[in-house]
Amino acid sequence: MALRKIIKMPNSFLRKKASAVDTIDNDIKHILDDMLETMYNANGIGLAATQIGIDKRLIVMDCGLKADDDLLKPNPIKMINPEITFLSKNFNEREEGCLSIPGHHAIVKRPDKVIVNYRDENFKQKELEADDLLGVCIQHEIDHLNGILFIDHLSRIKKEMILKKIKKENLNENRS
């Protein structure tokens, strides 16, 4: 496994719609493993392949620990070609952040429950119903695969404020 560089705003690759994965091979499995390692290293709970510059419909998540023999262990999820097939008509608001927009958070309104179809790392078809943090994470990461960022769900004013801050931060970085 290897750490990958996470692409940051305003890199235009983040706006790219990712391509479907046709077959699973060792390269795809290595990418998924690298994505998990990169996500954990960045203290994130989700990562899309487009965030590391890879044009593939791949996401990884770990929204919490699961109990196993009285020990808490990581609970990673790897999804290939994820597709949301159901969005609840009820909504929740939750603070979101993004590894590609570090240091910025905002309250985002999203459906409170989703059903997602995907393939696992063995290319077996799966379905998962998710709510709470996992449901939000799935929506957030699939948005990345469609070139959508969490700031796109904000009001125009809030989005512009964050974009101005990012621009200022980038100017300050370039001066250093």
Predicted regions and their residues:
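Positively charged
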Residues: 1-176
